[in-house]
Structure formats: C-alpha cells, structure tokens
Amino acid sequence: MGFQRDFNTKFFPLTEPLIPDAESRIMSLRDGKKKMSKSDESDFSRINLTDDPDLISQKIKKAKTDSAPIPKNLKELDKRPEALNLIQIYSSINKLEIEKVLNEFGGKNFSEFKNKLGDSLIESICPIGKKIKEYLNDSQYLEKVLIDGSQKASEIATKNLEEIYDIVGLKKFTWNSVFNLYNIYKC
C-alpha cells in the first residue's frame, strides 16, 4: 500500500481470496474447534490428497461426532462444532448450501451421512491424489515444469522491474551499459 500511495499508482493490486471463507478453514476430523493440519500427530485428524479410497472412508467413519441426530436447521449447529465441520465439508465438496444438506440429512444419524461424505471426498480427492503420484514418479516432467516455470517467472519479473523503474524514475541499467561505464571510467 505504501508504494501505491507514494508513487500514486495501482501497480500492485490488492489480492482477493480464491476460496470462499466457509471453505478456507476446514476443521480437524478429531476436534471441530481446531483447524485441520498436517502437523497434527493423528493422521485421522485430516484427509490427505494422497489418501486412498479405503483410508478416506475409514477416516470419515471415525471422524468425531456426537450421539444426537444431524440437526434440521443452522441454529441447532451452533453448539455442535464436529457436526458443523462435517456438514460444511459435505456442503463445500458438493457445492450445496448448508440448508440443503440439513434438509436432506436432518434428523438422520451420522452413519448414513458419513458414507455419503466419504463417497463425495473419494470422488473429488482420489483423482488429485492419482495425478500427484503420477507427477512424483516422473522426474523428467517435474524438472521440465521447474525450468519452464523459472523462465516464465524471470520474464514476468523482468517486465515488472522495468515498469517499476519507470514508475520510480530510475534509469534501467543493462549489463552492456555497466560494461560501457566501466570501459569509459576505468583507471
């Protein structure tokens, strides 16, 4: 913001989140008040992108819930963080409003819901995990991606620096101009 203000420019746009708030913070499968984290000791607190279908299903079935049936409305979810967490995950992965999920599953027990949630996660996550494993087993492809990415980043950075030099009022130095100055002023 300081650069924008000091040089009266909008060169560095403010970033906008790509993930909606409700989906940006997924809670632990073991504790609905804690964020899901790969640093958690228990592998059953999270779904990893490389988990196989059986493991995803097992983790969801063991996810912490209370003994009460699934709530029928949002207000009933207020004091049930584990239920809210699983319902939000299902809602996000299936692109449904939470109210629609509650209309479908409200009053039912969690076992049926967990089966549906597990199936949805398997359908969404397993293709990603398969691709990750393919990429990790193809070192030549990964090396090419790294080299291509480095070249693209360098091109973008060079272009950005040129624009920043213009905005700030600095003269752009090239190696040729540096060598010319050296040759002119060498002692």
Please provide the spans of the model-predicted regions.
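Conserved nucleotide- and phosphate/pyrophosphate-binding catalytic cores
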Residues: 1-187
